[in-house]
């Protein structure tokens, strides 16, 4: 588990991801943490399915690089966001980050804080030299999260903007 000022970040196991897809209430009971009902639905559910396929083929020590980390508001003891990488660092030491937070919690700095905590964790591992992210030009909030965490825009070809943050 990672801690920041207002958040606990809990790396979910493959079994916990599967449970969350089947029943968010069951996962909530297992973790003893209330979870926003739609946190693992829609695009998140599709991404979790992809994460599970990747995790199935990797040794357990690499799972934290592939899973979602559950963002829990310390004051409310409520899980309201997800943040994670899309795999272990590649040969160039690069990983891609993705994230999402429930709309009720948007605009309060939680995503910036969660991404920052996970970046600190990633860069504490020698094999991680850079983190990339992709976002749509219209997603101003996501772009602000990245810039506040030291990312720089590196390309804007196609429908997405690519950002990169290198180890300090």
Predicted regions and their residues:
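Glycine-rich acyl-CoA binding loop
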Residues: 109-112
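Conserved active-site tyrosine of GNAT-family acetyltransferases
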Residues: 146
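Conserved beta-strand-loop-alpha-helix junction that forms the acyl-donor binding cleft
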Residues: 133-143
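GNAT-family acyltransferases
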Residues: 1-96, 101-104, 117-121, 125, ...
